[in-house]
Amino acid sequence: MRDHGPMLSAYASSLSPEDPLSALTIGERPEPEPPDGWSKVRVRAASLNHHDLWSLRGVGLRAEQLPMILGCDAAGIDEQGREVIVHAIIGDPDWRGDETLDPRRSLLSERHQGTFAEHVVVPRRNLIQKPPQLSFEQAACLPTAWLTAYRMLFVRGHVTPGETVLVQGSSGGVATALIMLAHAAGARVWVTGRDPKKRERALALGAEQTFEPGARLPERVDAVMETVGAATWAHSVR
């Protein structure tokens, strides 16, 4: 991997609501230099999120911000040689409290260049020591999807062992994390999904039962984790 000069990146060079992949370019971009209080990370692994497709469609990204390197999540090696996970939310340095309420917060690749590159720069406070038992690839999948799932289950949902959790949607990063985290916490996990193979995979991840979308459930659940949207809202609140 090069130490200086242009770096290989995947970036939005245009915006296309109808054909987002046509707006994606793989090529060289200038290697970033960290401002004061920030650190450069040599990216060893980065993970995809649906956010990246939305960016290519122009959701949360304007033409005057282009080219924008995509990617919210990564794991790599910082300037001190530490193995780190990159936290994706860039907040106001003066904000105190729940960062999801910070009106000036953004995700990497919205205002600041993202992680789909050989290097990324972020505030030092955004770097978390990577657990040694996790590979770089595993660690890179954690920040956006798994933090979202954790917050849904335990911060907002207050799920406790023995409760029944319904996860609407059997695929996707957040749904996968919801199933595995809820199962690990001792909850009984039910999952809905259209695709039989994805429902089967949900069982392998820890779900106790799976159902067709909208199916009548054997009993009421304690918490519903909604990852689909309007198509399942009526079923979620029934």
Task: Give names to the regions the model predicted.
Residues H87-G169:
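NAD(P)H dinucleotide-binding glycine-rich loop of Rossmann-like/cofactor-binding domains
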Residues P30-S47, V59-R96, L108-G114, P131-Q133:
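Glycine-rich beta-strand-centered segment in the early N-terminal region that forms part
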Residues W190, A204-R238:
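Glycine-rich cofactor phosphate-binding loops and adjacent beta1-alpha1 units
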Residues L48, G172, A230:
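Flexible cofactor-recognition loop at the NAD(P)H-binding site
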Residues S16-I26, D36, H50-D52:
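Short N-terminal binding/cap micro-motifs at the start of the first secondary-structure element
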Residues R82, E118, E163, E208, ...:
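Conserved acidic residues
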Residues A139-A215:
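Mid-domain Rossmann-like dinucleotide-binding core that forms the NAD(H)/NADP(H) cofactor-binding site
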